[in-house]
């Protein structure tokens, strides 16, 4: 009876101490799976929706500086760097260029005939403006790094859809809109090969941990851009809604997993490729994490993402998008990431010898840390551009630690030598024959006995 009780107790302990069925580990990179450097969509697309146009909230006053600029002390930071000489690639919905957002064509992965300089969603244009929008005497807006060189790569668009029926609406590789994990991987490689020193990806694909997606090419592309070409990659943490269900917080009773990898229920990509990428969450004007900002053990920093101001197609200030019931304020981790990409460009200009990992280290080490030093909503904290550009801190490791798929060395196979091989075959046949004769003899002896 005592043995049975011990066995029951052991089973109960195993049940309560075992990680959840969906527990995951950080992704593993297959460095040899880099996709080809090719533009164009995965399959032919067509436009099925009219283009969106950003708008303005009632009673807006653009003469004053946006709250995010003051919160981040952007004007003070620009005394130390403005992004001059740094190239930032914006992988997004494209950019409609203007004198205040003078982007250059970087490639189109939505329309085979495009070059990246057409934006039917406004998202890419507004993202690019927050990164590197130029100032104007008529309003108070200026981007984080107004002297950067902007490259526009159109990789997604809700206005375009692949021709024909979709195979799997739950797979980010077969989404209802133009753009996929595969085309994102190709766009990362293309941006890196164009010489981008900072790559902004204000996109997020969410899926449940119980339904794994093949991201081999994306992981390889990110590793290639960072560790081979030397680009800093900044990505959005993602917004809750649709496929993006909020992740639970870490379990304090499991100190061996302080960031809560075992609690993750929703994977966000490319956000979960931290620390190769810097994943950015959103805060509001009160400095608190935004309700819509996806959390996860991969979040590295945070920046303003609510009630923002940017520039529209014509280079004029906008702060809303059209909604069913009127204008909707400009919110989202997409724009939080844009602020951090701009800061990465400033750091790159001021400290040109730093590696991507060291630039990320400088941004996170000088951030306004939350209680406890780090959490899954704001990571190391809200960025502090002035501190990132002025504090004296250790550079940190040249490369970020990351799990890479180990490929065994090729096995040496000597050239064929017919003589020895023939001898071995003959000897083997002779041995087999001898063994066979011996077996027959033993059977005969047993029968006689």
UniProtKB/Swiss-Prot annotation:
Coiled coil: none annotated. Residues 170-179 have a biased composition (Polar residues). Residues 160-179, 240-259 are annotated as: Disordered. Residues 66-389 form the Peptidase S8 domain. Its EC number is 3.4.21.-. GO terms for biological process: protein processing. The chain crosses the membrane at residues 421-441. Belongs to the peptidase S8 family. The N-terminal extension wraps intimately around the catalytic domain where, tethered by a disulfide bond, it forms additional interactions with a unique extended loop that protrudes from the catalytic core. It might contribute to the conformational stability of the active site cleft and surrounding regions. This is Mycosin-1. It comes from Mycolicibacterium smegmatis (strain ATCC 700084 / mc(2)155) (Mycobacterium smegmatis).
